[in-house]
Curated annotation (Swiss-Prot):
Entries under HAMAP family matching the protein: Ribosomal_uS19
Keywords (A to Z) from UniProt: Ribonucleoprotein, Ribosomal protein, RNA-binding, rRNA-binding
Protein name (database record): Small ribosomal subunit protein uS19
A GO molecular function held by the record: rRNA binding
Pfam families assigned to the protein according to its UniProt record, in alphabetical order: Ribosomal_S19
Family stated for the protein in its record: Belongs to the universal ribosomal protein uS19 family.
Physiological role: Protein S19 forms a complex with S13 that binds strongly to the 16S ribosomal RNA.
Encoding gene per record: rpsS
Gene Ontology BP, a term: ribosomal small subunit assembly
Biological classification of the source: Bacteria, Pseudomonadati, Myxococcota, Myxococcia, Myxococcales
Species in which this protein is naturally found: Anaeromyxobacter sp. (strain Fw109-5)
Compositionally biased tracts (Basic and acidic residues): 9-24
Disordered, as annotated region: 1-30
One term under GO cellular component: cytoplasm
Domain of life (superkingdom): Bacteria
């Protein structure tokens, strides 16, 4: 279920403050955050965030297409190692 329009998008106050400070000083340093739940606002475009995925910080460069999404969507928490091709190849000749 989507968030109510009258409430507006959620972004942690400490995160918006860091972005405002970076915009005032024209700094483009990496902003480190644990706030995966924050919505990407138009002010965030052009900044790089280091989003925590539970183990390490994943760098996320924000573009215009990302506005409205959550920061956590761009820092995957699970590692996909792929399906094993050996098991399928070994099981195929056994079936007759």
């Amino acid at each position: 279920m989507a968030r109510s329009i009258k409430k507006g998008p959620f972004a942690d106050k400490h995160l918006t403050k860091k972005v405002e400070d970076a915009n005032k000083g024209n700094k483009k340093s990496v902003i480190k955050t644990w706030s995966r739940r924050s919505t990407i606002l138009p002010d965030f475009v052009g900044h790089t965030f280091a989003v925590h995925n539970g183990r390490k910080f994943v760098p996320v460069f924000v573009t215009e297409n990302m506005v409205g999404h959550k920061l956590g969507e761009f820092a995957p928490t699970r590692t996909f190692h792929g399906h094993s091709a050996e098991k399928k190849a070994a099981a195929a000749p056994a079936r007759k």
